[in-house]
């Protein structure tokens, strides 16, 4: 038996879509949670049996095992060099035009691979990952990717449990961040800058309106000097930021009518994230803005307590909000990021070499989350339009200037708000994101 680890296959654990759709969103969340736990259990028992099987085969059947390190693996790799290109052409010939994107997801070093660092004397430990959104969200997927990479890098010594919807703090997002700062019961989390603003209003700078031209522009800022400044602030709260992931452009949905100009926003009851900056922006746009936990929003929209909300499409989709929101304005007005952090004490307990591995896995998970978050928009829009009858108003069909004019000067308002609260670096922060 040659233990070469050349080819892998997975198991899709699926439920019929019609059966799933017949459940309430709350019931769907329970099904997803139970399903993910069953998947994690199956992975564990599948992987943990190899050593026992090998020992039994040797004793009972006289099987000779050839380990990977004793094989000329490069000779096998060279023999199949270029098979990725063959596969892409095969798919294209069959009419599948997304083949290269699929291959890139599984083969790019930035997404799915990490070296074996199991010789670094890792402690056997389990870290709890928390995020505000559901099990099926890109946030949770980012946490799962980090867990997969860490388990692979450490030879299974470090494992990561996923707790979506801030389960460990009863759905309270701010308490989820506080639990991370305490290091118990959360050691790792992915939370929005808007939620962090409850602890430090400077994090609102990320979400000043209309300051990003594109996703590339956002990446350049978060991977550059602006992102470094945010990481420095996080460090002051006992957190080490492994990378800055993405919630994305917060599109506006509502149940009343199309929103094309600022006049359409007048008195619209909109749930916004817990941020003074967002509240100020929506006030200037004429909306009746209110704050509530994301976990409470679907019911509030269903009962018409609020008429609209604003979030990136993947986050809206993961919570099935499109079921009660027939209008969506794709205005790209406000963007928010996700801080992918580990408790500083947990991080400091590692050796410098181990810390480097954690940072590598963290950055790969961030890049993965960004990719899947962005690549899903077109599919989501097509499905919402077909299945839920959602009407989309594109940015090109909106009077964007009317929205910009309404929030003209909000940068200066924000800097003054920070000064009033004792933060003198507000203008420098704004300049990092707007110059």
Question: Could you say what each language-model-derived stretch is?
Answer:
Residues 1-217, 229-435:
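N-terminal secretory/targeting leader peptides
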Residues 222-228:
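Signature of the catalytic double-stranded beta-helix
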